[in-house]
Amino acid sequence: MAEKFIKHTGLVVPLDAANVDTDAIIPKQFLQKVTRTGFGAHLFNDWRFLDEKGQQPNPDFVLNFPQYQGASILLARENFGCGSSREHAPWALTDYGFKVVIAPSFADIFYGNSFNNQLLPVKLSDAEVDELFALVKANPGIHFDVDLEAQEVKAGEKTYRFTIDAFRRHCMMNGLDSIGLTLQHDDAIAAYEAKQPAFMN
């Protein structure tokens, strides 16, 4: 079972760029592994570092700013996660420590992959995201409260409502990935298999 997501309070980092694609999130040269760990070191590699080996941090990239170290909520712009359909993108984000991405819109495949990996993609309107960027930039180090059960983001003195479809919400709140969902029906699967003719087993 995956980790349950019900509520999360975390430091917010503002990535003020639209159309952030999966190659920017995790460049293709780091996709050799099929396990989910180890990708956080290369998250936004071409932006975070000045050299190809990832040894020289780029002081002008927001994730390297001291006030955003330990951030677990990423505030982004529209069409986040566009480009090729690599599941490594949410792997890199979660391995780095992100639990939530807030944006006006997401690429469809990235959006689905995020739920499969316990990364909550929160859609808010353009105007609401503009408000949040202004709030975070005026208050570096601010934390947001994200409540999946209530489907709310509390930021400063305001609360923002978002909607997640019931099935995905249920899965995240109960820590169910595709394997976990299958195991919920383990008894029924075993009973069905027991009824099959011997030559089918």
UniProtKB/Swiss-Prot annotation:
A single BP term in Gene Ontology? L-leucine biosynthetic process
The role this protein plays is:
Catalyzes the isomerization between 2-isopropylmalate and 3-isopropylmalate, via the formation of 2-isopropylmaleate.
- CC annotations in GO: 3-isopropylmalate dehydratase complex; cytosol
Q: Which UniProt keywords apply?
A: Amino-acid biosynthesis, Branched-chain amino acid biosynthesis, Leucine biosynthesis, Lyase
> From which source organism is this entry?
Escherichia coli (strain K12)
Checking InterPro entries in the record gives: 3-IsopropMal_deHydase_ssu, Aconitase/3IPM_dehydase_swvl, AconitaseA/IPMdHydase_ssu_swvl, IPMI_Swivel, LeuD
Oligomeric form and interacting partners: Heterodimer of LeuC and LeuD.
Q: Which reaction does it catalyse?
A: (2R,3S)-3-isopropylmalate = (2S)-2-isopropylmalate
Gene3D superfamilies in alphabetical order? Aconitase, domain 4
The family database entries (NCBIfam families) matched by this protein are listed as: leuD, PRK01641.1
Family statement: Belongs to the LeuD family. LeuD type 1 subfamily.
| Molecular function terms, GO-annotated | 3-isopropylmalate dehydratase activity
Q: In which pathway does it act?
A: Amino-acid biosynthesis; L-leucine biosynthesis; L-leucine from 3-methyl-2-oxobutanoate: step 2/4
What EC number(s) is this enzyme filed under? 4.2.1.33
Q: What is this protein called?
A: 3-isopropylmalate dehydratase small subunit
